[in-house]
């Protein structure tokens, strides 16, 4: 029944206590929009959600990280740091310890360089890999159409991302940079997402 469906718990729990207190977690079919100003730790945030203790990968979720802004090796390095509690300098100095600590989540995390790719490509990857969680870093750069109005571009890509989440029963986490209008504000809205 509809009442039973609304009582479903989220399949994947957040591992960040302050977030977990406000949001139960995520499940297939969810589109999660995450926005922040430049150089504020967006990639480290999703690395922590996925790879740190009790993160989605530790819970058994198959996670795909589609990176189109930073080099995929830099993104992967953040995940290694998050899962090992080691800086990259410490990882280089003790690769065997880093490998041992990263191993429990390594099979559940796949990285793909997505530079220049669009939402149709994202859908083909999701269809083939069948992930539980997809991270789009950065979501707006996957837009297949371009318009003078960034809201039109973002809306089309976000609708496609939402449809992917529903059709393939995965959670899609859409990372986005926020415009200067969002600087120092706590009351944010979708119009502040850059396209």
Regions found by a protein language model. Name each.
Residues 49, 122, 161:
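Aromatic/hydrophobic pocket-lining residues that form π-stacking "cages" and hydrophobic walls in ligand
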Residues 43-44, 151-155:
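Non-membrane alpha-helical structural segments and their capping/turn regions in soluble enzymes
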Residues 30-32, 63, 131-136, 170-174:
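Generic beta-sheet signal
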Residues 1-85:
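The Walker A/P-loop phosphate-binding site
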Residues 25, 39, 156-195:
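Phosphate-binding/switch region of NTP-binding enzymes
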Residues 24-26, 55-58, 101-104, 126-129, ...:
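Conserved catalytic network of the ASCE P-loop NTPase/AAA+ motor domain
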Residues 59-148, 156:
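Conserved inter-motif catalytic segment of the P-loop NTP-binding fold
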Residues 12-17, 116-117, 187-191:
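Short gly/ser/thr-rich secondary-structure transition/capping motifs
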């Amino acid at each position: 029944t509809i009442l039973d469906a609304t009582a479903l718990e989220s399949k994947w729990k957040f591992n960040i206590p302050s977030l977990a207190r406000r949001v139960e977690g995520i499940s297939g079919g969810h589109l999660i929009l995450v926005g922040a100003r430049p150089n504020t730790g967006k990639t480290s945030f999703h690395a922590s959600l996925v790879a740190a203790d009790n993160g989605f990968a530790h819970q058994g979720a198959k996670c795909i990280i589609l990176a189109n802004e930073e080099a995929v090796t830099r993104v992967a390095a953040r995940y290694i740091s998050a899962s090992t509690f080691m800086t990259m300098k410490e990882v280089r100095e003790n690769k065997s310890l880093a490998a041992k600590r990263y191993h429990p989540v390594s099979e559940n995390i796949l990285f793909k360089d997505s530079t220049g790719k669009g939402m149709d490509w994202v859908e083909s990857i999701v269809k083939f890999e069948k992930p539980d969680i997809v991270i789009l870093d950065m979501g707006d750069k996957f837009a297949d159409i371009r318009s003078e109005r960034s809201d039109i571009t973002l809306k089309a890509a976000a609708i496609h991302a939402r449809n992917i989440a529903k059709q393939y029963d995965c959670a899609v986490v859409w990372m986005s940079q926020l415009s200067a209008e969002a600087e120092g504000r706590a009351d944010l809205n979708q119009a502040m997402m850059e396209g």
